[in-house]
Amino acid sequence: MSGASNDGYGQYPPQQPGDHQQQPPYPDQAYDNAAPVAPGHAADHGRKKKRQYAASAFDVGVGGNVVAGGQPIPGAAPYGAPAAVPAYGGYPAQPEVQPAAYGAQPAQPYGQPAAVSGYQAPDPYYPSAGAVPAPGGVAGLTAGFQGMNLGAGAPGGIPQQQPQQLPPQARAGPLNQLYPTDLLNQPFNVSELDLPPPPIILPPNASVTPSPDANCLPKYVRSTLNAVPTTHSLLKKSKLPFSLVIQPYAALHDLDDPVPVVQDQVISRCRRCRSYINPFVTFLDHGHRWRCNMCNLTNDVPQAFDWDAAAQKSVDRWQRHELNHAVVEFVAPQEYMVRPPQPLVYLFLFDVSYASVSSGLLATAARTIEASLDRIPNADRRTRLGFMAVDSSLHYFSVPKDTDENGETSMLVVSDLDEPFLPVPGELLVPLTESRRSIENFLTKLPKMFEHNQDNGSCMGSALRAGDKLISPLGGKLVVLSASLPNVGHGKLTMREDKKLLGTSKEGSLLQTAATFYKSFAVECSKNQVSIDMFLFSSQYQDVASLSNLPRYTGGQTWFYPGWNAGRAEDAIKFASEFRDYLSSEIGLEAVLRVRATTGLRMSTFYGNFFTRSSDLCAFPAFPRDQCYVVEVAIDENLTKDVVCMQTAVLHTTCNGERRIRVMTLALPTTTNLADVYASADQAAITTYYTHKAVERALGSGLDSARDLLQKTITDLLQTFKKELAGGSMGGGLQFPSNLRGLPALFLGLMKHVGLRKSAQIPSDLRSAALCLLSTLPVPLLMQYIYPRLYSLHDMPDNAGIPDPETSQIVLPPPLNLSSEKFVPYGLYLIDDGQTQFLWVGREAVPQLLVDVFDVADRTQLQVGKATLKELDNDFNERVRAVIQKSRDHKSKGVGSIIVPHLYIVREDGEPSLKLWAQTLLVEDRADQGLSYVQWMGSLREKVSS
């Protein structure tokens, strides 16, 4: 199946050679008949024969994938035959003319390109989809343009538009149909989390061009509702949230995710609401004017809109990027600049206290920066770097230019922490291009300068103030690398961890900032266009709760490495790899984000790491590429249009000194029908919204309040659905739409997450760091962080762990639900939440498996804990390593991230604390005061029926 991402991520195994049946039309069927070759009789296909690690002691083929359908039970129907189990949504497979359940893919032979995930054509869902358009479709569109004299000889030389077909999102047909499912009898399957959101079905000719890219892809902007209620009262009645999840960048580098760029600086905007021209406007008056799709005002089309100034010739309007693509980037003219574009500035604040030096942090950080100098964006040769060292004093470094023959880096020490002055400010920020050799020499010597430092003090707060003062004339990034609690000077913090408070109602106080300095200083930095990123490494209490305020209000991020020590190769490699990618990432500077919408809609609340400068303007001194943002939408007036639009614009300076505006336009149909609203709700976007809401609640009112919010929300949704759409009667079941079937499991995962769960064992630093991730991770990574991935490796299908012949991407085994019921004692499993990976070795794993994967014959010799899997010369080891690596691959998930998860080897009969930690990721099991999935569903049924 060439499905959502065409790369094996969350895919089912492709068809084996020799099979000619079509792909089953339902994911569950594909899932239940995934491997045509019986265990132990795998066809060779020119590769080494697959080993059966359980065969020596147990029935062949019994294991995790059997539960999921990875290996068929002997005597099962051949691949492609109708499945015995109900199809997705709990309904029998229907004839082709009937609409299939939400999420079903069209039946098609393997190798045939599938519809792109996201807003694909609704062909598989509706009988009317793809039918010849009725009069008034394409013909009407063309006739309309002819009536406007937009033929080849029209004034201005605008050629006549001749669309070949309707765009995929503008087919005729009803909105998504509602498919109720019984959550108790047809439980959630983890593979459903890989399905695209319900399709956005717009009326014919909603966009001005027939481009397939006219509407925004969900990887950039996704709505919790893909059909919008026309009234506030209907939205309120639904109990569903209406919000946008916005991730303007899908990769760390433009090359990995290019978007069309409008270079000619002709930017047409609405005079009243300031929206940018987009595929959903309409043209009037022979194409000389356009009507805004947000506020309905008629605007003049700029004279240069149909003219190429560089080539001095007229151009085809209908080829312009902004009329064909929902996501475009405009090169901004002079009026979009308050001052000349700022250069990229990094000021590194090194903790050089005893804790930092002894853990190897200083040496590793200096070495990584030195090795990454070529990767720091510097295309315009204006990038500047500065360096400060911090213990109980401030150490400034003046790095000379390479042309200074006798130039030596000089260190200046300042001990006055209350009003730290800047010695020779002009020499502290040096151009990378002009001082490259001197910077390398300095970074080589830096660890030696402090190798015998016994100072335990850290005046990081004072250092931050000095750093802000130093770079605020230009703006830029303060990069903090700290292994100790700031204990002297401004923002001094004390050890406040109190184990007696953990797990109590007072625990929330430990998650709030201990000093007002950190928020007020962060807001000041934001005004100065200074962003702060924190890399925190302490093995002791570090007050992540206070320090994380600095990135939270300045568009930065907090990275936490508990118990980090460079003496462990895995620790050193993880940080060096992540820091290297961090330094090479392209970022936006001096950025602001604003969302505009159709009249009647208003952006009411904003969530994410930024400072809200006015009611609807989010300010980012630096705009990262690995975070997402949530905006709540209010319906202030009744909506009278069939389609509403929301347009996100990010004005920023690129690393290369170019001012640009990235514009993302999302169009959604409206409805007066509650069933349409539920049938078009996006469970991943809803979960993301409530994650941000729960984090806000945890930081403001405490963890109990956050968990109560989630419990109440899911109960309200189930009760509303029962009362309004299930006829008030459910019998003994629990009805919910099939497209929201994963919501209870996701909410349970969130309530049991390390950031939110009730426990007296979780240090507050660990919780605070988890809350930072919960409120910033892009949707695919957040879903995995809340509901981790579980793969059975000992019996994975033959094609797993090797490249797909068509896409060349490694194929992953089918994911399993997070329950210990999926485990067998001789199994090998990978549990991966995107931040940490656990390789679980069963207590009865056979020697051959241990030899092939770990190169040890006896399980007791297996080293548990942080590890790097050895490269061994056998087929199975190679496949296991490929699966581990592929599971870490962010690009295939359509996101940018620097995270490289640690790999822990866990023996079922080994280190108890490590085993318990891995088991906390099994969301559907009962653990640490948390309900199992079965208990959770039972309690929800009681609440809903009471």
UniProtKB/Swiss-Prot annotation:
Keywords per UniProt: Cytoplasm, Cytoplasmic vesicle, Endoplasmic reticulum, ER-Golgi transport, Golgi apparatus, Membrane, Metal-binding, Protein transport, Transport, Zinc
GO BP annotations listed: COPII-coated vesicle cargo loading; intracellular protein transport
Protein name per the record: Protein transport protein SEC24
The keyword Zinc belongs to this UniProt entry's keyword annotation: yes
Function text: Component of the coat protein complex II (COPII) which promotes the formation of transport vesicles from the endoplasmic reticulum (ER). The coat has two main functions, the physical deformation of the endoplasmic reticulum membrane into vesicles and the selection of cargo molecules.
Subunit field text: The COPII coat is composed of at least 5 proteins: the SEC23/24 complex, the SEC13/31 complex, and the protein SAR1. Golgi apparatus membrane; Peripheral membrane protein; Cytoplasmic side.
Location of the region described as Disordered in the Swiss-Prot/TrEMBL record: 1-52
CDD domains for the chain: Sec24-like
Comp. bias regions, Low complexity: 7-23
Membrane topology: Peripheral membrane protein
Recorded family membership: Belongs to the SEC23/SEC24 family. SEC24 subfamily.
Subcellular location: Cytoplasm; Cytoplasmic vesicle, COPII-coated vesicle membrane; Endoplasmic reticulum membrane; Golgi apparatus membrane
GO terms assigned for molecular function: SNARE binding; zinc ion binding
Chief localization: cytoplasm
Record-listed Zn(2+) binding positions: 270, 273, 292, 295
Spans annotated as Zinc finger-like: 270-295
Gene Ontology cellular-component terms listed: COPII vesicle coat; endoplasmic reticulum exit site; endoplasmic reticulum membrane; Golgi membrane
InterPro entries the record matches: ADF-H/Gelsolin-like_dom_sf, Gelsolin-like_dom, Gelsolin-like_dom_sf, Sec23/24_helical_dom, Sec23/24_helical_dom_sf, Sec23/24_trunk_dom, Sec23_24_beta_S, SEC23_SEC24_subfamily
